[in-house]
Amino acid sequence: MNEDEAIQNITKKIEREKALINAANAMRSQTNNEAVRSPLDSQMRDGRRNLQFFEEKLRDIQLRKVGQGVEGMSLGADDAGRPPPPPKDASSAAWGDQAAYGQQSQVGPPSDLAPPRHNFGAPGPGAASKARPNFTKLDLIKYDTPYLGPRIQHMLSQIQFKLNVEEQYLKGVEKMVQLYGMEGDRKSKADAAARRVESKQKILLLKQALKRYEELHVDMDSADAQDDDSINTPNLRKPLSGQLSIRVVAIKDVDHATTGRFARGPETFVAVKVEDTVMARTKVSRNDRWEAEYHNMEVDKANEIELTIYDKPGEHPMPIAMLWVRISDIVEEMRRKRIEAEMNSSGWVSADRMGSTGAPSQFPMSPTSGSFGGSPQAPGGGQGQAPGPFGDPAPQPQVVTGPIDGWFNLEPAGQIQLEFSFVKENRDKRQVDLGLGRKGAVRQRKEEVHEMFGHKFVQHQFYNIMPCALCGDFLKYSAGMQCEDCKYTCHNKCYPSVVTKCISKSNAETDPDEEKINHRIPHRFQPFSNVTANWCCHCGYILPFGKKNCRKCSECGLTSHAQCVHLVPDFCGMSMAVANQILEGIRVQKQRQQKTTSLSEKTLRSGATKSPTTAGHGSSASFSSAGAGSVPGTPSAEATEAARLMYNQTSPQRPGQPGRAPSDLSAAAAASAAMAAAQGRTGYDSGPQDPYGQGHYGAAGPAPQHHKYNPADYANVDQGFPAQPPAQQRPPQPQQQQQAPPAQMPPQQPPPQQPLPPQPGQQYQQQQPAAQKPQPQPPATAQGAAAGPPGSQRKALPSATDPGTGARIGLDHFNFLAVLGKGNFGKVMLAETKRSKRLFAIKVLKKEFIIENDEVESIKSEKRVFLIANRERHPFLTNLHACFQTETRVYFVMEYISGGDLMLHIQRGQFGTKRAQFYAAEVCLALKYFHENGVIYRDLKLDNIMLTLDGHIKIADYGLCKEDMWYGSTTSTFCGTPEFMAPEILLDKKYGRAVDWWAFGVLIYQMLLQQSPFRGEDEDEIYDAILADEPLYPIHMPRDSVSILQKLLTREPDQRLGSGPTDAQEVMSQPFFRNINWDDIYHKRVQPPFLPQIKSATDTSNFDSEFTSVTPVLTPVQSVLSQAMQEEFRGFSYTADLD
């Protein structure tokens, strides 16, 4: 519908509402009967509200129409040569100027619970970014809600779904009536007939409500609703258990059942259903009011409450109105009430409500403060602590919130006054105001993958209604199968019947089965305005409202998300069940034909031989056509398989590497495998120019030096896009490699027959003369760095089976002195070598636990990340000295950092701004190094940041790191520590490096304010806070601190600070770090603001006494691992520099 049609449609609706209001007013003036006047007054109130809603929509369309005409007009000749605005606020010249980010319009009163989307994105020309309205699903069903537009969309979807379910229920009841009639069971037949009457009445009420909302709905493009983020959020949608309390107070303006002329009013009561089971029922009332109607009930894993109002005009009760409330919405509303009460009592405000005045003079981080430095402080005291409203933690009074009370809309007419509350059954409940504390990380358990025609089906528990893509029936709050690649969703019983290939695979269009099916008619998907409950025919999730992300086939009527259209098979007019039956028949017939053909070929070719010369020419011709080079012959299957295993080619191809022809790849693999076999090793040699030929940390010869950290690389950070850092530049390559295409430029000199792209599993030469150590390449300009593809600057990952350069060691080389930490993974223990008495921290993990939880690959990945940290001896990353294993355990021997972690120190005393800034700068450089090497950390928190005796930090615990994550790469594993998890992780979306910068923002917040920005009584409440709440700040907090936190804690990952291709440079250029000399920070030339103290080398007072008081022994393991299990850990041992 275009603008003119929408204007005409809304004008008609406005005229209709005015006529209804005038008619009701005229009727009201003609009577004094309050029983008649009351519904007329209600009708007039609703009409005025609808009239206001239509007039606002009319103004919006008219303004949009005018804006479209102005948008294409040029404002002057000077605009033609202007570049587009930068994607990030690089200059940060006007932090308080909201116009720099687009005008913000808030629906309803200002609030601190829902920040606007795209806070810092560059606005498009003529576009004004609107703030996300601050309402919950419970707000939409309240009678006095100001959000009429979202309410109409929400109720259209809900009522349509309820109508579909009730119609299915009625069909079942009618069958029951027929069966009981055939059996002669009169009592059961009468009960079923009564249920049939009630079901028909409910369908009538739902149709009336649906018609009313359809009349109010405005079909226009601007009504497009964003995808409901909570639809894909299992934590918000999972069933809840606990105690539900409901008080029914009164109802009004309902359409009561008709009674006789002289009869009294009908008896009315309210039934409360939880998951279709009647849990409570009020007393009957004739005046629509109830006194002391309190009902407490225990619910177990429930989703929704249904309240049905019944009238009893005769023998059987008749439903007259209904209301549905989700239990999760009640919990969220109570959490928000508690947060609002705490916010009002503490005096803290959100960033957009802070004053524009400058920071008070007592704050050490004012814009005019000097550079970093200062004398060491005593333990627990940090230089630059700020007393007053900013320095002190926010007061955390114990706020007791009452029940939710209000009038709620009934369908199809009327209101009901309710009081309800819900107390969750929390086994791990904790007080919100306890401050910072240790919290373990969580990781999604790896599920069993069921391969089926390219699909990787994994069982999921769905907490909402979803249809099966195969049979079409609904999965109602139950488990189902979903493909990890294309999100194809079906029943557990249906996935074995799926024979359509996973269309996300590259060879789907050449699948022989699909080519042979006669019915290959593509769907004609077109955008349509979704105003009712429709589901995607592929992934099963409900479609959002509007046209933007909704598609519908004009021929068969299938509906789909816009992003799922290309995944739907071309079976228009045929159900998926029938299509799968046909394809299954084709597959069985093809197998029979292949068996027959193979038997005949054996008979016909028993005496025939093929000329080797002809075969060789044919193979060479095919290679020439593929452009593979001069490698003769087609590789054998054995050679290709050996090369695949050697290079461990299991990870997906990186975006920066262009795909090769299959023959090209197989030939290269075969050639490499042959050369490796000839040289008698499992990897190819590093050339003299190998940038990493010196080996890993602790290799023989002089230790590798740091790359020169050139301050000139950051000279342009204030201009927004600084030069590329030297760590991303490649060392000089041989002449023949420099002339090759950038995407094929390997980090090591390959065999001369075939250049290969860098492989994750390739190994480095472990020893080389020191004279051949490469020199760092001079830093390139930003333009030069951006000229090549991203893949040309990536560094190859180390091998998980690298044995290192030192002598083999074992458990008998160490004496264990103390336990430093414990977790689900095992222990971290302090140990010393028996010969030299050197101290190390040894991480001990049980093999049985690793195998049971399918964490073998994670352990190998952790070792590779350690080797990446060892590669340049990064000053702020924990280094690995050795790995070894016994029959029952594996051991990581790491450097011992005796200063403890930052969690212990912040619990002893607040850091202050200067100390927090110092630690944040060093953490920023550590994250920068990880990201430059394709690693995201995913578990940044105070517990994992250790403090050395010289006052500098080191990041530890690489168990959740993910490799091969470059700019643009994504993953989807649900993992991290709850308070630090980014919204995209919670929403089960693909995420990239930006999750580390979100956690970095939470870390800075905790160091500055000694509390977490997102808090709750349990994990679910923390997740709710991350998705809905806006962090609060002291009213006088420095503007630079608020600015960087606001930009790092942006919910949209593509708009978050640090999410761009320059990564850490965006963070380093912020005014919060304006006094930082990054070269001095990297080389530890800045005096730390605090030095931890120990009494002796083996003093463990900086570690939690809960762990250090435990006797340092290894508990015996009773289980015995099989030889196959032990093979999983082959190649794990590694030694660098132990004596």
Swiss-Prot record:
Describe the family membership recorded for this protein in Swiss-Prot or TrEMBL. Answer: Belongs to the protein kinase superfamily. AGC Ser/Thr protein kinase family. PKC subfamily.
> What's the source species' lineage?
Eukaryota, Fungi, Dikarya, Ascomycota, Pezizomycotina
What protein name does the entry list? Protein kinase C-like
Domain AGC-kinase C-terminal stretches: 1074-1139
The REM-1 domain covers which part of the protein? 1-67, 142-219
**SUPFAM superfamilies, A to Z:** C2 domain (Calcium/lipid-binding domain, CaLB) (SSF49562), Cysteine-rich domain (SSF57889), HR1 repeat (SSF46585), Protein kinase-like (PK-like) (SSF56112)
Which GO MF terms does the UniProt record name?
ATP binding; diacylglycerol-dependent serine/threonine kinase activity; protein serine kinase activity; zinc ion binding
- Give the matching SMART domains: C1, C2, Hr1, S_TK_X, S_TKc
- Organism, per UniProt? Hypocrea jecorina (Trichoderma reesei)
Positions annotated as zinc finger (Phorbol-ester/DAG-type): 454-502, 522-572
Q: Where is the composition biased (Polar residues)?
A: 358-368, 594-614
Per the record, where are the segments of Pro residues compositional bias?
723-734, 743-760
Gene3D superfamilies linked: 3.30.60.20, HR1 repeat, Phosphorylase Kinase, domain 1, Transferase(Phosphotransferase) domain 1
Q: Which residues form the Protein kinase domain?
A: 814-1073
**Region of interest (Disordered), residue spans:** 72-132, 349-404, 590-637, 649-668, 679-804
Q: What InterPro entries does this protein's entry cite?
A: AGC-kinase_C, C1-like_sf, C2_dom, C2_domain_sf, C2_fungal_PKC, HR1_rho-bd, HR1_rpt_sf, Kinase-like_dom_sf
